[in-house]
Amino acid sequence: MRVGIGYDVHKLVAERQLVLGGVVIPYEFGLLGHSDADVLIHAIMDALLGAAALGDIGRHFPDNEPRYKGISSMKLLEEVREKLAVKGYSVNNLDAVVVAQAPKLAPYIQAMQQNIARTLQVDLDSVNIKATTTEHLGFAGRGEGIGAYAVCTLQQG
């Protein structure tokens, strides 16, 4: 059994779609980034890569690489799953939390879990996504950005 942890944060800006867990969420701001800036998927990818001792997303998907400009992070997650499979790993369990003051994410959690489970080719009950606020404290509480943490376990075979 291997354990990984991931973290990511992106700035909220106008004129960008907000994408979390592969779900487009109606909101006046979106996350700034080279790809679609899906902070949840980025944290998950870092956890998965770390558990397999494969480095981090910056190593595999550098933000100065033109082919990743605007790419769906779900596509990158699929590539991470393939990298894990090459090393003989599969996802046993994934738990993640999105830290955002707004918007409310509860209505979208199930769709996020379904997208992630489908992409990782695991049962839905192997993926848990939560959302929390910071009670108006820090950058997330001021609405300047959104962060995400993820923990995973991998198994061989």
From Swiss-Prot:
Free-text remark on how the cofactor is bound: Binds 1 divalent metal cation per subunit.
Keywords: Isoprene biosynthesis, Lyase, Metal-binding
Top class in the EC scheme: lyase
Residues bound to a divalent metal cation: 8, 10, 42
Site residues by UniProt (Transition state stabilizer): 34, 133
PROSITE patterns found in the cross-reference section: ISPF (PS01350)
Family: Belongs to the IspF family.
Oligomer status and interactors: Homotrimer.
Purpose: Involved in the biosynthesis of isopentenyl diphosphate (IPP) and dimethylallyl diphosphate (DMAPP), two major building blocks of isoprenoid compounds. Catalyzes the conversion of 4-diphosphocytidyl-2-C-methyl-D-erythritol 2-phosphate (CDP-ME2P) to 2-C-methyl-D-erythritol 2,4-cyclodiphosphate (ME-CPP) with a corresponding release of cytidine 5-monophosphate (CMP).
PANTHER family recorded: 2-C-METHYL-D-ERYTHRITOL 2,4-CYCLODIPHOSPHATE SYNTHASE, CHLOROPLASTIC (PTHR43181:SF1)
Full protein name: 2-C-methyl-D-erythritol 2,4-cyclodiphosphate synthase
Organism phylogeny: Bacteria, Bacillati, Bacillota, Clostridia, Eubacteriales
